[in-house]
UniProtKB/Swiss-Prot annotation:
NCBIfam families (alphabetical): membrane protein insertion efficiency factor YidD
Alphabetic keyword roster: Cell membrane, Membrane
One Gene Ontology term, aspect cellular component: plasma membrane
Compartments reported by the entry: Cell membrane
InterPro entries documented for this protein: Membr_insert_effic_factor_YidD
Principal place of residence: membrane
Source species of the chain: Bacillus anthracis
Protein name: Putative membrane protein insertion efficiency factor
SMART domains named among the record's database cross-references: Haemolytic
Membrane topology, as annotated: Peripheral membrane protein
Function: Could be involved in insertion of integral membrane proteins into the membrane.
Membership in a protein family: Belongs to the UPF0161 family.
Amino acid sequence: MKQIFIGIIRFYQKFISPMTPPTCRFYPTCSHYGLEAFQKHGAFKGFWLTCKRILKCHPFHPGGFDPVPDKKDDKVNS
């Protein structure tokens, strides 16, 4: 399932993004953030993180450096 989302993002990057001026307020860009989120966290959490990021990408948010959070280890280290 995550490969479908990654394919959609890559399609956007290759065919749609070059036709529009760069407007993302963040680094990495929202599409690169989405790719990394899906690769690190899988389909469900990657989708959630990408949606949250896209909703923050508007003129009233200052933007800046906003990396994908690291995957938390579910194991408890003793």
